[in-house]
Amino acid sequence: MESTPPPDDCSVKVAVHIRPLIGDERIQGCQDCVTVVTGKPQVQIGSHSFTFDHVYGSSGSPSTEMYEECAAPLVDGLFQGYNATVLAYGQTGSGKTYTMGTGCGDSSQTGIIPQVMNALFTKIETLKQQIEFQIHVSFIEIHKEEVQDLLDPCTVNKSDTNNTGHVGKVAHVPGKPPIQIRETSNGVITLAGSTEVSVSTLKEMAACLDQGSVSRATGSTNMNNQSSRSHAIFTITVEQMRKINTDSPENGAYNGSLKEEYLCAKLHLVDLAGSERAKRTGSDGLRFKEGVHINKGLLALGNVISALGDEKKRKDGAHVPYRDSKLTRLLQDSLGGNSRTVMIACISPADINAEETLNTLKYANRARNIRNKPVVNRDPVSSEMLKMRQQVEYLQAELSLRTGGSSCAEVQALKERIVWLETANEELCRELHEYRSRCPGVEHSEKDFKDIRADDIVGSVRPDGLKRSLHSIESSNYPMVEATTGDSREIDEEAKEWEHKLLQNSMDKELYELNRRLEEKESEMKLFDGYDPAALKQHFGKKIAEVEDEKRSVQEERNRLLAEIENLASDGQAQKLQDVHAQNLKALEAQILDLKKKQESQVQLLKQKQKSDDAARRLQDEIQSIKAQKVQLQHRMKQEAEQFRQWKASREKELLQLRKEGRKSEYERHKLQALNQRQKMVLQRKTEEAAMATKRLKELLEARKSSPREHSAGTNGFGTNGQTNEKSLQRWLDHELEVMVNVHEVRHEYEKQSHVRAALAEELAVLRQVDEFAVKGLSPPRGKNGFARASSLSPNARMARISSLENMLVISSNSLVAMASQLSEAEERERAFTNRGRWNQLRSMGEAKNLLQYMFNSLAETRCQLWEKDVEIKEMKDQFKEIVGLLRQSELRRKEAEKELKLREQAIATSLGTPPSSVKHVAEDLSTPSPMTVPAQKQLKFTPGIANGKVRGPAAFLDTNKKMVPMGQVSMRKLSAVGKQGGRLWRWKRSHHQWIVQFKWKWQKPWRLSEWIRTSDETLLKSKPRLKALPNKIM
C-alpha cells in the first residue's frame, strides 16, 4: 500500500478505566487506594500522581462515554484510510475482557468491540451508494508464545473434541503449517496462514467474534474464575473503492472521466492477558507455565513502551526490542508505527493490588510519550494509474496546443476568462433564484385581494381599470429577468407600492383592534376580581344585548350599502362612490366578525363562571370534610396521649432493666477497649517495622542511584589502586545483596500486613453481619465461633469495635500502599539495572576473578554458619524433646503421688477415726522439708522436665520472638553442664529477661513455679518413708 503522511505525528492516547471493588475484595476489607481529581483526568495513588487523556470509573467520567471519546474517532479514521489500534492493558482481574467485549457472556455487549461493529456497519449503510466496501475479520491469540487461529474451523473442531479441563485451548492440527509472522518489503507486519473471513453484515461479524471468544484459552485462578490465558487480537480490515470525477476547468474538457481510489485500513482490537503473581493466583503446573509466558510477553511489551517513551533514546535512535516476543512483533505498527493507537489501562482500586496498579499506571504514563506516524493507505496500482492518466491528459493538452499554434500564455488567459465567466454566471443564477423565490409571495397577495373583491363587490361590478391593473401586476413577474423597458418597471413599482400600503393598513387595523380588545379584557379582569354573581350576570347580559344590537345595526348598514351600490350608475363618479361604499362595507364586515368573536368570548366567560361556581361548591365541601377530619384528629390525639402515657410507664420499667444491662455492657466495653488497645499496639509495631524496612530499602536504592561506582584508571597493577578497586567491588556487591535482602524483607512485611488486614476485615464483616441480624430481629448462625463471640457483645460495644476495626483497616491500607509504591520503584530500578547489565562495570578478567573469589568466600562462610545453626537447632530440638519427656514423666509421678496421698489419708482417717481434713494437715506437715517449698523470690531449683503451660511443638518453640532466647545466644554446653552437676541449684531472678521456656500468659512467672507444682521427685522420695512410718506409730 502506498502511504500519504499527514502533516503532524500523533501520540498514543491513554485512558484509564477504574473498575469497582468486587465481592472478594470487599470481604477482605480492601479500601480504595486510587483517587481521581474532580474535573481533571488525573489519578493519584499514594504519593504518585498521573495525568492521562481520559479517566473512567470511580469519580471520573462514566464508562458509557468510553466508546464515543476513545474508539469512535478511530472508526471514523478507518473510512479515511488510517490504521487504528485499541489496546487493553492491566493486571489480571482488572476488567480488560469486560472493557473490550471479547467475553462470551451477555455483559460483553457493552464492550468496545460490539459498539465498534455497530458503528462500522451503520456508517457503511450510509456510504454504500458512493463507495464499494469489502470487510474482512481475523481473530488470533498468542498462547504460550504460539500464534493460533481462533477462526479456523479445523482448529476449533479439534479443540472441541480433544480439550478437557482447559477451557478453550486451541489444539494444533497435524499437517497444517503453523502461523508465521512476516514483514513485507515496505515494513508491514502480516500473518502467513491465518484465516480471514469476509463478512457483509453485523450478524456475521458478531458470529466470528463469538466463535473466537469461545475458542480462546481461559482458566480459573484464585483471582479470577475465568482468567484469559492468552493475548487476543481481533482485526477488522476495511477495503473501499471510491470513484472520483477528474473533470476540472484547467483541462478545458468535460468528458465525464472518473478515477478510482482504493483504500485499505485495519483496526486491531487487542485484549491482553493480565500480569499475575503465582502467589496471588495460586497457579501451578500448566497454569504456572501459562503465567510465565504471559509475564514474559508483557515484560517485552513494557520494554518496548519504555524504549519508545524515552525521548532521549528516541532521538538517539536507540534499538527498540520488537523481536523479543511475538506480541510486540505483531504490535510493531501500533506502537511507534503506522497507526492511531488508544491504550486503555484497566486498574483495580483495591489496596491489596496497589503494587500492580502503580506499575500499570507507570507504563500507561510512558505510553503517552510514544509518537506514531499514521498515514493514509492507498493501493499503489490505483495511484500509479492515476498518475499515468494525469500525465496522458497533460500530454494531450500540450499536443493540442502545439498543433493549434496557440501559445501557452493565450491558453492561460482563456482559462482565466473561463473561470471568471463561470463565476459571473453563478452570481447571476443566484440572483435569478432570489427574484423567483420572491414572486410567489406577490402572486399570493394579489390572489387574496382578488378573492376578497370577488366575494364582496366585484361579483356585481368589474371595472375595466381594475382588470388592467391585475393584468399589469401579473405581467410584472417576468420582466425581472427579461424586460428592460421603462413601462414594465413602473408597473412593477406601482404594484409593490400598492401592496405595501395594503399591508400597512391591514396591520394598523389589526393593531388598533388588539389594543381595544386588550383594554376590554383588562376592565373585565378587574370586574371579575371582585365580582358579584348577580351583577356579573347582569353585566354579561347587557354586553350580549349591546353586541346583538350593534350586530343588527351593522347588518342593516351593510344591506343598505349593498342596495345603494346596486342602484348606482356606471359612470366615473358612481364608480368612485362605489369604491368608497365598498371600503365601508369591508370595514363593516370586519366589525361584524369582531362582534361575533366578542359574542363567543362572552359565552366562554359564562362557562368559566359556571366552572368557578362549581369550584366554589367543591371548596365548600372540602372545608366541611376538613372540619370533620379535624374532629377525628382531635379524638385520635386523645387516644395517642393515653397510649403514650402507658408506653412511658412501661419504658421506665424497661429503663431500670437497661441500666443494669448498661453496667454489664460498660464492663464489656472496658474489656473491649483493652483488646483494641493491644491490637493497635501490635498493628502499630508491625506498621513501624514495615516503615523501617521500606525506609532502609529506599535509602539503599537512592544510594545505588546517586553513588555509582567510580572506576579507577589503573586496574591492572597490584598497588594501592588495585586494592582500592577490589574493596570498592566488594562493597558494591555487599550493597547489592543488602538491597535484595531488604526487598525480600519489605515483600515479606507486605504479605504479612495483607494477612493481618484480611483477619481484621473478616472480624469486621462478622460484626456487621451480627449487627444486621440484630436490626432485623434474627438470630445469627450457630456453630461459628466468630458469630458466637460477636453476639455476646452489646450493641454499643459492637459499634465501638466496628469503628476501631475500620480505623485499623485504614492504617493498614495506607501502609500497604506505601510499601507497594516502594516495591514498585525497587522492581523498576532493578529491571532497568538488569537491562543495562549488572556486570558491565567489571573492566577486566582480574576484577571478575577477584569478585568471584570474594563471592565464593562469602558463600562458604555463610554455608558454614548455616551448618552451625542447623547443629544448634538440632541440639535444641533434642533438648526440647528431652524436656517434654521429663515433663510427662514428672506429671505421671505427680498424679501417682496425689493418688497415693489420698489413699493414705483415707487409711489414716479410718484408723484414727478423725475427719479427713485433719489428716490432710498432718500429711502437709510431713512434706514441709521439701526444697520446693523455699520462697520463689529467693531461689528456685532448675529441674529438667518441669515446665508450665501447654507443651508446644518444635516449630513454635524455635520461633524467634522477643520473649524467647535468641538462637545462638545460649550455649548448649552450659545447659548440659547444668544437667550434669548434681545438687547444684539453678537460680532464676526477677530481673532476668531471657528464659529457655516461653511462657504463654503474663501471669505465668518462672519464679512462681514452686507455687504451681507442689510435689517434685525429691519431695516424693522424702515423704514416702515418713508416710509409711506413720501407721506403725499409730498402731
Curated annotation (Swiss-Prot):
Chain segments annotated as coiled-coil in the UniProt record: 408-436, 504-707, 881-911
Kinesin motor domain sequence ranges: 11-370
Highest taxon of the lineage: Eukaryota
Cross-referenced CDD domains: KISc_KIF4
Protein residues bound to ATP: G90, Q91, T92, G93, S94, G95, K96, T97
Tissue expression pattern: Expressed in stems and flowers. Detected in cells undergoing secondary wall deposition including developing interfascicular fibers and xylem cells, but also in dividing cells and expanding/elongating parenchyma cells.
One annotated GO molecular function: microtubule binding
Hydrolase recorded as keyword: no
Changes seen on gene knockout: Reduced length of roots and inflorescence stems. Altered orientation of cellulose microfibrils in fiber walls leading to dramatic reduction in fiber mechanical strength. No apparent alteration in cell wall composition. Lower expansion rate of the inflorescence stem along with the reduced thickness of both primary and secondary cell walls leading to mechanically weaker stems.
InterPro entries cross-referenced by the UniProt entry: Kinesin-like_fam, Kinesin_motor_CS, Kinesin_motor_dom, Kinesin_motor_dom_sf, P-loop_NTPase
Subunit structure: Homodimer.
Similarity comment text for this entry: Belongs to the TRAFAC class myosin-kinesin ATPase superfamily. Kinesin family. KIN-4 subfamily.
Domain notes: Composed of an N-terminal domain which is responsible for the motor activity of kinesin (it hydrolyzes ATP and binds microtubule) and a central to C-terminal alpha-helical coiled coil domain that mediates the heavy chain dimerization.
Note: Overexpression of KIN4A/FRA1 caused a severe reduction in the thickness of secondary walls in interfascicular fibers and deformation of vessels, an increase in the number of secondary wall layers, which are accompanied with a marked decrease in stem strength.
Function: Kinesin-like motor protein involved in the control of the oriented deposition of cellulose microfibrils. Its motor activity is directed toward the microtubule's plus end. It possesses the potential to drive long-distance transport of cargo along cortical microtubules. Regulates cell wall mechanics during cell elongation, by the regulation of primary and secondary walls deposition. Contributes to cortical microtubule-mediated trafficking of cell wall components.
Protein name: Kinesin-like protein KIN-4A
Source organism of this protein record: Arabidopsis thaliana (Mouse-ear cress)
